[in-house]
Amino acid sequence: MAEAAYTVASDSENTGEEKSSSSPSLPEIALGIDIGTSQCSIAVWNGSQVHILRNTRNQKLIKSFVTFKDEVPAGGVSNQLAHEQEMLTGAAIFNMKRLVGRVDTDPVVHASKNLPFLVQTLDIGVRPFIAALVNNAWRSTTPEEVLAIFLVELRLMAEAQLKRPVRNVVLTVPVSFSRFQLTRFERACAMAGLHVLRLMPEPTAIALLYAQQQQMTTHDNMGSGSERLAVIFNMGAGYCDVAVTATAGGVSQIKALAGSPIGGEDILQNTIRHIAPPNEEASGLLRVAAQDAIHRLTDQENVQIEVDLGNGNKISKVLDRLEFEEVNQKVFEECERLVVQCLRDARVNGGDIDDLIMVGGCSYIPKVRTIIKNVCKKDEIYKGVNPLEAAVRGAALEGAVTSGIHDPFGSLDLLTIQATPLAVGVRANGNKFIPVIPRNTMVPARKDLFFTTVQDNQKEALIIIYEGEGETVEENHLLGYFKLVGIPPAPKGVPEINVCMDIDASNALRVFAAVLMPGSSSPVVPVIEVRMPTVDDGHGWCAQALNVKYGATLDLITLQRKM
């Protein structure tokens, strides 16, 4: 990759405010990119509809990997592999979406140690060490750098086909991504010379496409269109997302979201462990054979697996569908749990659902289809979308809408009312996570809670921000922290500490903190405003250091205010 691909553009170059001087009369084009764990796609609004771009091999779906076998790294956009096994020699890094923004204590990182490239951990809460095998030596890199190299190739491919510079992009992301992971995605885009208009949860992008289809159907039927409830189930190689959306007249309101980092990679690893001989390391040949078996089991009751492992070791096994489903029972149970949770959070029953939309590669697995159809009490799956293209089409639509492009036929008169996928709150009441903005709150959102001191004459308070759903802070993602100083001396429980959180339409989170005293109508010290997240690397170290340094001396407890 050219040196420029590794250069992070300056802040001014990534504002997205510059326009191409060569084409001043043309509206800014925004790409829609769906970067999947195993493959990606890229699309753009061409003036009348969404157009999915193809690579030089005429493929809409592009494998998500970067090879380091030469001095110049090459991604799946430009690099053509002679055989699938070339990606499994250690010289290629893939599954980068599963690794971006994760620390080395994360179970997903530990599961990635089975991959052909090097993944090392110290288990102390810092970024894992990853490396590719180049000329019999390990070359270190980061998931963000790998993602940036891949994004550069996508951008260059798009610019070559569109014959104009491209800067703006809408990327789809998993529901379960933390804000720290989102900032890492944005950083990779900046390294690739792209300005992020929006990081869009994948089911939200699909909901936008669904809203457009319902709007067009309503126009064709000359009606106003009644509200339709849909469940969106999206399961790819690395993540599983669920959403309940209410759609009417081109407006899609996300009523609930749920997500988990489970996907086809987990199913693949389970299958490999099942068919591999005892003490046999997972080789590239075994991975390819297991993947092929899973694909064939979508329309066959059993498959024959033949793998020559070398040195006289061979695998010859028949794998039937029931056996495959038993091996992956926990994954399928998690899929069911997510849908049940999402329906419960949306306060709807399966019988209330008008359409069941299933997308992503794993949506073809018969067991997955059966489970989700049963939970949603649907006999049929919505056939209006391509399961492998729905997310990128929705992202391209959002790119056109956000860019202010007008369509005379009204096909871009669309709006998605988003919801917060994870709760945001503070550490208080000991080691408890106290949500300030609950999960599935409509965005934009602004909420506050009151806390108070735990020590007499406590002059400072530590405001520690977390994101997640766990009851204790250790179960959640640390976003950042700051100190509130200048609290007037008073008995514990007297000062009122107001913590306000604000999430705007672009999903930016700001935290405000103020100190009030009895009899005072205004803050006694200046209000503090901090944009989150503030923590970069070293989540584990930060949390541990805060405990060692301050203990419970600057803690807060929830204040029960008299109404």
Curated annotation (Swiss-Prot):
Residue(s) carrying N-acetylalanine: 2
Entry keywords, A to Z: Acetylation, ATP-binding, Chaperone, Nucleotide-binding, Stress response
Molecular function per GO: ATP binding; ATP-dependent protein folding chaperone
One GO term of the biological process aspect: response to heat
Keyword Nucleotide-binding: yes
Domain of life, per lineage: Eukaryota
Region called Disordered, residue ranges: 1-25
Keyword Metal-binding listed: no
Pfam families, per database record: HSP70 (PF00012)
Role, per record: In cooperation with other chaperones, Hsp70s are key components that facilitate folding of de novo synthesized proteins, assist translocation of precursor proteins into organelles, and are responsible for degradation of damaged protein under stress conditions.
PANTHER family attached to this UniProt entry: HEAT SHOCK PROTEIN 70KDA
Family, similarity comment: Belongs to the heat shock protein 70 (TC 1.A.33) family. DnaK subfamily.
Name the record gives this protein: Heat shock 70 kDa protein 8
Organism: Arabidopsis thaliana (Mouse-ear cress)
